[in-house]
Regions:
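N-terminal beta-strand motif that seeds the catalytic metal site of vicinal oxygen chelate
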Residues: 1-21, 74-76, 128-136
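Conserved short beta-strand elements that form part of the metal-binding/catalytic scaffold
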Residues: 34-68, 121-127
Length: 136
């Protein structure tokens, strides 16, 4: 909950990618996101519920390394620790690069990190206090 009156929270993240079609396939097929809007062949907006991921194809000035892009990672909440483990194996089976394998953290959460086709790091996270909450 925001401490600023009227501010409801983060609406979306926008990513610059080399190939919007490849990125779209990854986020749909691997992470199960649906297309909300596709105004043209260089832009697509995806969602898995109350979130929004904007993907924009950039050819000029694309920073090729993840370090140059200044984005640490995206985090997706998962319903259970067991499901995090299952997803890691499903991602391995699909050929997705695992950046950091499954780990149980000291606060009782658990996660692994993978990378999308552009090297953007994604954390798949079970967090006991959040994973079972439903957004209304």
């Amino acid at each position: 909950m925001s401490q600023i009156p009227g501010l409801r929270g983060l609406r979306h993240i926008a990513l610059k990618v080399r190939d919007v079609a490849q990125a779209k396939r990854f986020y749909q097929e691997v992470l199960g996101m649906g297309v909300v809007w596709e105004p043209d062949d260089k832009n697509v907006y995806l969602s898995s519920g109350c979130d929004n991921l904007a993907i924009h194809e950039v050819t000029d000035g694309f920073a090729h390394s993840a370090e140059e892009r200044q984005l640490d990672h995206l985090g997706f909440i998962v319903e259970s620790m067991d499901r995090v483990r299952e997803l890691e194996q499903e991602f391995v089976d699909r050929g997705v690069t695992i950046v950091h394998p499954f780990k149980i953290h000291r606060d009782g959460s658990a996660s692994f990190y993978c990378a999308d086709p552009d090297g953007i790091v994604i954390q798949m996270l079970y967090e006991p206090q959040l994973s079972l909450q439903t957004i209304k």
